[in-house]
C-alpha cells in the first residue's frame, strides 16, 4: 500500500513526530511505501520528496509559534495557512503526480502551518483520507480547552467567538481574531467533514468530537503505540527519585507538582525533564523554596538511552496535567520501562491508569490531593514494583507498534474498500 503522511513537522519535535517516525519506518519495513508531506524546516529528516514540501510560514530556523517574529508578511502567510492555502494544494498535487499510485492519506498535525485545503486536493485525486486527532484544535481556538488556566468548553459546539472575546490565542487580539475567523471558515467549507475516518487515542477525545458535531461512525479509538527502542541495561536499578518528562509548559500543571513536593518535603529528588515553552521552566524555578533547591532538578531535554534510563530508574513518574490531556504517551513509556505513574484525573488519563494496579490518580490542580497520593506512593515502595510490572505487562500485551500498525492497516483497508464502492 502507498500512504502519504501529512504532518507540519518532519523532525523530532514531540510525541506526534516520534509516532510519525516510528509508524513510517515500521510500515516501510513491512513492504508498504510511505511518503511524507511536510514543511521544510532546518533539521528536517532527509526525504526524496523534500522538494515538494511547503516553505515555512516564518523563519526556517523557528518552527514554533512562540519564537516567530510576526512581521506583516509572516502574518499574511499564517492567515493563508490557517484558513485555505492554494500554495499547499499546488505543492501536494505535484507530490501526488510524482508519487503516482497513492492509495490513502494519513493526516496528523497540520493545523495553522499547512492548511486543511489539502483535503480537497486528496479528494480531487480520489484518494481517501484518514486523520488522527490528538488535541482539541478543531474544537478550541487555543487547542487546549483552557481559559485563564482552567478547563473551558465554551467553543466545543461551534461558538468560537468566545476565543476572540477572551483573547484565547497567546492573549493576543489579532492572533485570536485570525484563528477564530479560520475556524468559522473551515466549518463553513466543511473541510474536516470530508475526512473518511478519524483516529483518536481515547474515549474522552471521541466524546468531545461527537459533542462538537463530528460523526460517531467515522471516529475510531486507536491507542498510541510504544516500542522499546533500547534494550534495558542490566546495571540499571531503581533509585531514590521521582520524574516528570515531556513538555515543560503551563497546561502540564508542573507548578502544582512543585507545590506538593515542597510541602511534602520527602527525602527524595524530583527531576523535571523536557523542553521549556514560553519561559515556563524559569517561572517554575522561581517557585522553588530554599529548602528544596538542591532536590528539584531541570536536566533539560533528553532522548534515546538517556531518557530511557531516567524513566527506568525512577520510583515512579508524575503526569500532573491541568488540561484535558487526551492520552499522554509518557504514561505508556513509563509502563514500558516498569515504572508506575501518578497522574491527574482529567481528560483521557483515567482510561490509561488502573488505580492501585498500574498507578494512582489525583484531582487536577489539587496540591493537597497530590501530597496525599505522593505520600502514599513513597510509603508503599514495595507495591511500586508490582504496579510497574503490571503496567509493563499491559503495554507489552496490547500497545506495541506491531499491534497498533495491524489495527491501523485494517482501518485503511476498510476505508479504501468503502471509498471504491461509492
Spans of features found by a protein language model:
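Short alpha-helical donor nucleotide-sugar binding micro-motif in glycosyltransferases
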Residues: 301-302, 309-314
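Conserved donor-binding/catalytic core segment of Leloir-type glycosyltransferases
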Residues: 199, 234-252, 258-262, 271
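Conserved acidic donor-binding segment of nucleotide-sugar-dependent glycosyltransferases
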Residues: 355-356, 360-367, 376-381
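Carbohydrate-associated surface elements
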Residues: 204, 225
Amino acid at each position: 500500500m502507498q500512504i502519504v503522511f501529512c504532518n507540519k513537522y518532519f523532525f523530532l519535535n514531540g510525541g506526534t513526530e516520534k509516532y510519525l517516525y516510528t509508524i513510517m519506518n515500521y510500515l516501510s519495513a513491512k513492504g508498504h511505501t510511505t511518503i511524507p508531506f511536510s514543511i521544510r524546516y532546518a533539521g528536517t529528516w532527509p526525504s526524496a520528496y523534500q522538494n515538494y514540501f511547503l516553505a515555512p510560514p516564518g523563519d526556517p530556523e523557528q518552527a514554533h509559534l512562540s519564537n516567530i517574529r510576526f512581521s506583516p508578511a509572516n502574518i499574511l502567510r499564517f492567515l493563508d495557512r490557517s484558513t485555505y492555502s492554494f500554495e499547499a494544494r499546488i505543492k501536494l498535487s505535484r507530490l501526488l503526480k510524482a508519487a503516482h499510485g497513492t492509495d490513502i492519506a494519513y493526516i496528523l498535525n497540520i493545523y495553522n502551518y499547512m492548511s486543511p485545503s489539502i483535503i480537497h486536493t486528496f479528494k480531487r485525486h480520489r484518494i481517501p483520507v484518514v486523520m488522527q486527532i490528538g488535541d482539541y484544535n478543531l474544537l478550541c481556538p487555543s487547542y487546549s480547552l483552557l481559559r485563564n488556566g482552567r478547563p473551558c468548553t465554551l467553543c466545543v459546539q461551534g461558538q468560537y467567538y468566545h476565543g476572540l472575546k477572551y483573547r484565547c490565542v497567546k492573549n493576543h487580539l489579532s492572533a485570536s481574531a485570525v484563528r477564530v475567523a479560520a475556524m468559522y471558515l473551515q466549518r463553513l467549507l466543511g473541510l474536516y467533514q470530508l475526512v473518511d475516518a478519524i483516529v483518536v487515542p481515547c474515549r474522552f477525545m471521541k466524546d468531545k468530537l461527537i459533542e462538537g458535531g463530528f460523526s460517531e461512525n467515522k471516529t475510531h479509538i486507536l491507542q498510541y503505540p510504544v516500542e522499546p527502542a533500547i534494550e534495558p541495561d542490566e546495571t540499571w536499578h531503581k533509585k531514590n527519585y521521582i520524574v516528570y518528562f515531556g513538555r515543560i509548559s503551563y497546561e502540564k500543571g508542573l507548578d502544582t507538582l512543585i507545590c506538593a513536593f515542597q510541602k511534602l518535603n520527602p527525602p527524595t529528588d524530583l527531576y523535571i525533564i523536557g523542553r521549556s515553552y514560553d519561559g515556563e521552566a524559569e517561572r517554575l524555578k522561581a517557585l522553588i523554596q530554599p529548602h528544596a533547591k538542591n532536590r528539584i532538578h531541570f536536566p533539560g531535554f533528553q532522548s534515546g538511552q538517556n531518557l530511557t534510563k531516567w524513566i527506568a530508574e525512577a520510583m515512579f513518574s508524575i503526569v500532573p496535567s491541568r488540561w484535558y490531556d487526551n492520552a499522554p504517551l509518557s504514561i505508556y513509556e513509563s509502563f514500558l520501562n516498569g515504572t508506575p505513574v501518578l497522574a491527574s484525573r482529567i481528560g483521557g488519563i483515567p482510561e490509561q491508569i488502573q488505580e492501585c494496579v498500574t498507578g494512582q490518580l489525583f484531582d487536577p490542580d489539587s496540591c493537597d490531593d497530590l501530597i496525599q497520593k505522593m505520600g502514599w506512593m513513597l510509603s508503599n515502595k514495595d507495591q511500586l514494583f508490582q504496579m510497574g510490572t503490571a503496567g509493563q505487562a499491559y503495554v507489552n500485551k496490547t500497545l506495541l507498534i506491531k499491534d497498533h500498525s495491524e489495527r491501523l492497516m485494517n482501518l485503511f483497508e476498510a476505508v479504501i474498500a468503502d471509498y471504491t464502492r461509492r
